[in-house]
Amino acid sequence: MVAGPNGSGKTTLMRRLADDYAVNFYDVLNADDIYAEVRRTGAYAPRMSLLDGILRSYAETTSYPEEVKSFFRDGSITLESDLIRFAPDAVNSYTVALVASFLQSMHILQKSSFSQESVFSHVSKVDALREARNNGFRTYLYFVATESAVINAARVENRTALGGHSVPPEKIASRFPLSVANAAAALPHLSRAYFFDNSSETMRFFAEWDEENGLMSSDEANGGFPKWFAPIADAAKKIPVSGGRFDVQPNPALSAPAAVASHDAIARAFAAGLQVTVMRGGKIVRVSPDGTETEVKGDLS
């Protein structure tokens, strides 16, 4: 699971981990990518073999509203010959989310490895990790966030200007604490977790969770944990483990792709003439391509 609030840098981090660190993410279930493919082609091709008709049966078991399930019931969304087809009026974020949930369940049922990219603001994502763990999977979480939803909102604004999807600032702000809380709640269901802070110009890998050793980091003793990490650190200390140490240094092999990921994003923004929003000296600032700095006042609360 690659997770974190909207605009934290999940997609860029995931790409760099795969390219530079050779992380195998297997079949990546990303609702945004599924939505884009369905909008473009009217269909989505799962990377697994599935029985015709099983999607409709699955939809009926979910808690989605009837108006969403009706698209599966009336044949507007069908699974035939390993292709999920959507009628034009059936394409929306809710139907796509249900399909992503279905594919997740099928992977767990078939015991085939997969990954998800998620804002992690809904408890169902914690439930998915619990279910996978209970079915014999090793579960990994890569979680990235920033010190302020203001930074995230500004980066989503840049993403939108570059052709990506938008998210309202108030939704980013409301989801932010939920994402962090769910990361804390997920710890007992994880084999391992890696935590990244993307507040400044350089994304930083600063802590690791291991089911045997607990929270491993050199940053706590140095006062270096980002503020957003406090609920996760508190939860980690309450979970009994066999070891536990704070003398390890951040893994250079993970630190390098994280740094490159953030630098890539900044380079894309500057190339398009956009400002970037980062933490500098404890302040949130907007930096122009020419290096001009402007402090950002206020918050999204």
Language model segments and positions:
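The feature captures the helix immediately C-terminal to the Walker
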Residues: 14-15
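Walker A/P-loop
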Residues: 11
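Conserved substrate/cofactor phosphate-moiety recognition/catalytic segment
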Residues: 18-109
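A glycine- and Lys/Arg-enriched "phosphate-lid" helix/loop adjacent to the NTP-binding pocket
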Residues: 134-182
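NTP-dependent small-molecule kinase module
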Residues: 187-240
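Amphipathic, hydrophobic secondary-structure cores in small proteins
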Residues: 254-293
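The conserved Walker
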Residues: 5-6
